[in-house]
From Swiss-Prot:
This is Phosphopentomutase. Mn(2+) 1 binds at D13, D339, H340. Keywords: Cytoplasm, Isomerase, Manganese, Metal-binding. Its cofactor is Mn(2+). InterPro entries: Alkaline_phosphatase_core_sf, DeoB, Metalloenzyme, Phosphopentomutase_DeoB_cap_sf. Gene3D superfamilies: Alkaline Phosphatase, subunit A, Phosphopentomutase. It is found in: Cytoplasm. One of its GO terms (cellular component) is cytosol. The keyword Isomerase applies.
Amino acid sequence: MAKFNRIHLVVMDSVGIGAAPDANNFVNAGVPDGASDTLGHISKTVGLTVPNMAKIGLGNIERPVPLKTVPQEANPSGYYTKLEEVSLGKDTMTGHWEIMGLNITEPFDTFWNGFPEEILTQIEEFSGRKVIREANKPYSGTAVIDDFGPRQMETGELIIYTSADPVLQIAAHEEVIPLEELYRICEYARSITLDRPALLGRIIARPYVGEPGNFTRTANRHDYAVSPFEPTVLDKLNEAGIDTYSVGKINDIFNGAGINHDMGHNQSNNHGVDNLVKALKDENFKHGFSFTNLVDFDALYGHRRNPHGYRDCLEEFDARIPEIIENMREDDLLMITADHGNDPTYAGTDHTREYIPLLIFGKSLSGHGHIPVGHFADISATVAENFGVDKAMIGESFLDKLV
């Protein structure tokens, strides 16, 4: 019998808690990640007031230097630790896949200087459309259409851009490049990015409408992902007939594998929490696992190196935690974690190789305190043991520590 009837995992995208032991093997603008510390530097440079996470034990997590503005709790309300990544990557897909039990020994490719000419030329030859070379770099999805949408409306050229993650995105005005044509081009791009030197996690169709100065992206986005190369704990739960709910981009990250209830994309972190609360309240969701990704920390503030905005975003999420807890049942378990770091005070604009925090709360738990430092996949091993399914490739359960 399951110790917890429902487990809810919330990933605060990019909220790292200090450089990982191998951080110097990863770089940002030529600077090794060894001094990165997302939460530590936010707390130190702009202050951080997150009383609800602090109450569970955020400030108590073992660190070389305590978080400056997050107090340590003498009597925390939950369990806490930090987890180390073993996979060879610091991107979203790698982090989430490892959390669900996989060891990624061959990282996806990212293109900080844009995609190679060979890929762009192949897409041009297939589509019969030119590619706007100036857009070929990591770009904000709204900024790229503001900057190049007017030109696309005049010329019909393709807007191809990337991000910190291993993705190729194609933006197209629906009245200039019809959806069916955009999807066909994306399917072709998917077919040529399945191996090195361009092994990409996702190809994303990004249609938009409107006039210059007033463009808006539409709901006709489509992701062409790759499925995890081995079964994850999500697959094992699904095969056992256990409910698996996804909130935000979780469904995209896993290409739908192992997910039987998708709550859809989030318009914002707050919208994501709204969707999680809907899942918590779902009368039909009696037994199973929910998996939520909140991406604003990363997309809006980490990559843009905006510590003030990042702090505000953390505080906004923290203020929603009581609502999440209020809607939990007595036999629910909440786990709050991250997938990598993205220190907004650091060099460059890329993710940072860091430990991730793990906060655990349940209304039925009488104990509290520190759990030994472990690895990302320990989360899924714990979920697997709770629901009586096999774990995936890696991970050690800490279920027996939760009393």
